[in-house]
Amino acid sequence: MQVSVETTQGLGRRVTITIAADSIETAVKSELVNVAKKVRIDGFRKGKVPMNVVAQRYGASVRQDVLGDLMSRNFVDAIIKEKINPAGAPNYVPGEYKLGEDFTYAVEFEVYPEVELTGLESIEVEKPVVEVTDADVDVMLDTLRKQQATWKDKDGAADAEDRVTIDFTGSVDGEEFEGGKASDFVLAMGQGRMIPGFEDGIKGHKAGEEFTIDVTFPEEYHAENLKGKAAKFAINLKKVEERELPELTEEFIKRFGVEDGSVAGLRTEVRKNMERELKGAVRNRVKSQAIEGLVKANDIDVPSALIDSEVDVLRRQAAQRFGGNEKQALELPRELFEEQAKRRVVVGLLLGEVIRTQELKADEERVKGLIEEMASAYEDPKEVIEFYSKNKELMDNMRNVALEEQAVEAVLAKAKVTEKATSFNELMNQQA
């Protein structure tokens, strides 16, 4: 076997391999012997068919199969010999084959980039320092009550916390536009569902009033014909409702799994859940900064084959979220996912290099802790932990999570980390 390697462009490589004619003939004869032992041909007993008959009937197909097998095996031998690390599937380019002559073919592929981590000491990370206060728990209890609230008619004017039922008709330059009209439209105020100025125009009005509000569509509005346009909406305010919050009764509290039904028990449970969320939010905030710094400090080439593969993964995930199938996933435009796919590949390569250079292995105690932390959010944590422990795929996934955490910690060990006091609400809003 003769091998030559050339760089085509960037991470592209082309390996040219020549297989000696005698190697091909030896492999063909060996395979024909195997075929002769198995085939049945009229007039001959199984395993007793003369070789010339076997060669005449099966020689061409056997030779084709042998060439394909030799191409694959010799390529593997070549990349091992040349210490090449291919990224993605190779593209075989067969040469012309002539019986009795050496056979030359080429294989084109990309290689993984050589990554040398730099600039870790220049990475700056701001770690939030947060405590869950009694006031934070009060706010969360109010949120829980609002989620369970009922609505009752309100005689007064609408404000930011109310719900309204309206008819509206929108127009631009005196002309109604498509999608600008609705009847009995129920709008929960304060959620930012409508364009800027729409809700503000309703505030202060009472049920039964008819009025017109002036708004301007944002420049980034999805409808091209409405971007930046001034519009008028004729409003018929049919109903104004206000929330009626439930009291913290024993019955209400027990809905949240607090068996004794006490306010103190609910506060304890809410605080515990908030602290678990807080721990994850701090971890994610620090991790995202460390990874962002790592990416900025290390500009690397990325094999297009890996990006293609990641795009396919993202397509399938998107299709699954919306109930689509494999065919629909492939029809989703590549450009929707390309930037995210490239980012994920870059992060994977850089963290992989951290893991390699630091010789990291998943810490089983950390894996156990991650599973227990995740399971604590479920009604029966022990059942969840047991389910994970019996599922190899889930355990491997959790080991990968632990290993990634360890890699991020290795980056943080060299980065400039400062602490900043932050409120629970501020941090959680940053995560949203």
Swiss-Prot record:
GO CC terms in record: cytoplasm
Domain PPIase FKBP-type: residue ranges: 161-246
GO molecular function: peptidyl-prolyl cis-trans isomerase activity; protein folding chaperone; ribosome binding
GO biological process assignments: 'de novo' cotranslational protein folding; cell division; chaperone-mediated protein folding; protein transport; protein unfolding
Reaction catalysis annotation: [protein]-peptidylproline (omega=180) = [protein]-peptidylproline (omega=0)
Keyword tags: Cell cycle, Cell division, Chaperone, Cytoplasm, Isomerase, Rotamase
Compartments, record wording: Cytoplasm
PROSITE patterns: FKBP_PPIASE (PS50059)
EC number: 5.2.1.8
Family: Belongs to the FKBP-type PPIase family. Tig subfamily.
PANTHER family from the UniProt entry: TRIGGER FACTOR CHAPERONE AND PEPTIDYL-PROLYL CIS/TRANS ISOMERASE, TRIGGER FACTOR-LIKE PROTEIN TIG, CHLOROPLASTIC
Its biological purpose: Involved in protein export. Acts as a chaperone by maintaining the newly synthesized protein in an open conformation. Functions as a peptidyl-prolyl cis-trans isomerase.
Name of the protein described by the UniProt record: Trigger factor
Protein's organism: Citrobacter koseri (strain ATCC BAA-895 / CDC 4225-83 / SGSC4696)
Gene name per UniProt: tig
